[in-house]
């Protein structure tokens, strides 16, 4: 019997999990445990098409969630089918340029990179530790798959900030990029569609969800991306500001009297679509009310304008090379037709033309081209599948 891969994505207060067949991509189990360390900690899942849910108990966290999965959700047969465990790790720093089997040295490296991702990497380390306990027989078959790895091919002029060089050399202050697994996956998928070798494809990929980023990919390798030292840089996002004048931070602190913690909270959790609408971080609100509500229009226009600027910039970055495709993915990229249309309409100078009928049809998991036959460049919707990449990388290294 072929072996399946258990995929774990641990957040500070949640745990996403799935079991996939790495060969076929068939999903056997998926679920989410959330509200860790609160009175209403709970878990929900989908197993063989059937949904389930349960309370984990007040104060429950990663350990209780994994124990519940093993004891109450997995059948003996499904548990025995797990051949390895893949962990999504947000930040690998400069050290990790590809997925790797987890050893004590790798754990130390993830811990070291926690300085760059203090909300994420410590939670990933908890997930690794708990996976070792829950599946002791698979301790040497745990694999780390890094969000930052795909972007490690960026040239120096793309990843360095114009800061004192010592900040990079001594403290690692540089642009790292995120969503790498998603950008990698859709770049390979669109290469199949346009009939180009993955190692030769030139594409601009737009991963748009509550977190959002763009990547410029030349010959299958990332040469630039919109997120930077942290996932705060770049596009307008659900609650994150994206790019802004750094001096605004001084103003908020010196003139408005805001503390560093308050400023961080504002930029990370109270800005983006939420800040612009003053109502919600949900893009569906901005899309549904675009024609009638000033706040929705303000947020949608800001989101699409910023995105179009990045796409245009990356068309320039690709230089003399051709552009095979622009790809939209992620929850917003795959479903928000208005976002795609408004964004691409900013790029008419490049000869890009949207086919409204195709654009409207490409949603709810449907992939397809959304540009007209006479468009100078092609744009596609490609649903992402980060779990499949994690499963395949894990299988390659540990099975």
Curated annotation (Swiss-Prot):
Binding site for ATP: 16, 207-211, 282-284, 331-335
Binding site for Mg(2+): 9, 386
Residues annotated as binding substrate: 88
Pathway field: Metabolic intermediate biosynthesis; acetyl-CoA biosynthesis; acetyl-CoA from acetate: step 1/2
Main location: cytoplasm
Cofactor: how and how many bound: Mg(2+). Can also accept Mn(2+).
Protein name from the UniProt record: Acetate kinase
Gene: ackA
